[in-house]
């Protein structure tokens, strides 16, 4: 028997920037027993991320920016090194990531390769992230990057080996970035 889910109630607790739901549902277990659950679910929309890499220079482009959630959770500076990313905002994932790449890193990417889609925190967050990689070259630099309006983003071009080491030292602690760097390493694209 497959599990059956019945929505009992969906109460919106907050919808200031993203939406926080309080969901009550019945879950029929495989053994037939019905269990009532009540959970908070944070709907922040879906997103996309991209890792830019250069096989000739053996470099990657990452960004550093303030992330309030990490600061609240003990990251003293709140600064996080991560891959370029953004919310889809009704765009297709590839359209979104091309816009984000030029806004955040300053690079106008050519061919992009979609790797996979992953839920990053499925216990309470709805977000599905689309993961991409793209090779970049210096002549694709259209502007300085740094984000738009209220963003304060530092663009980092790092040796690939240094970025991998930064995972070990804890300087890179962002899940999507670790996944993309590890993908690049295991795919041997930088060998």
Curated annotation (Swiss-Prot):
Biological process annotations from GO: nucleoside phosphate metabolic process; ribose phosphate metabolic process
Swiss-Prot/TrEMBL cofactor(s): Mg(2+)
Ranges where the Nudix hydrolase domain occurs: 43-180
Pfam family, one: NUDIX
KO phenotype (gene knockout): Cells lacking this gene show no defect in their capacity of forming biofilms.
Activity vs pH: Optimum pH is about 8.5.
Classification via CDD domains: NUDIX_GDPMK
Residues that hold Mg(2+) 1 according to the record: 85, 104
Positions of short motif Nudix box: 79-106
Reported impact of residue 151 to A: Decreases catalytic activity rate by a factor of 4, but does not affect substrate affinity
GO CC, alphabetical: cytosol
UniProt: Mg(2+) 2 binding residues: 100, 104, 151
Mutagenesis / variant outcome for changing residue 176 to A: Decreases catalytic activity rate by a factor of 820 and substrate affinity by at least 2-fold
Catalytic activity, reaction form: GDP-alpha-D-mannose + H2O = alpha-D-mannose 1-phosphate + GMP + 2 H(+); GDP-alpha-D-glucose + H2O = alpha-D-glucose 1-phosphate + GMP + 2 H(+)
Keyword Amino-acid biosynthesis applies: no
Oligomer and partners: Homodimer.
Family of this protein: Belongs to the Nudix hydrolase family. NudK subfamily.
Domains as described in the record: In the dimer, the N-terminal domains are swapped between the two monomers, such that residues of both chains contribute to the active site.
Its biological purpose: Nucleoside diphosphate sugar hydrolase that hydrolyzes GDP-mannose as its preferred substrate, yielding GMP and mannose-1-phosphate. Can also hydrolyze the pyrophosphate bond of other sugar nucleotides such as IDP-ribose, GDP-glucose, and to a lesser extent, ADP-ribose, ADP-glucose and UDP-glucose. Shows no activity toward Nudix substrates FAD, CDP-ethanolamine, CDP-choline, NAD(+), diadenosine pentaphosphate, GTP, UTP, ATP, or CTP.
Protein name: GDP-mannose pyrophosphatase
Gene this chain is encoded by: nudK
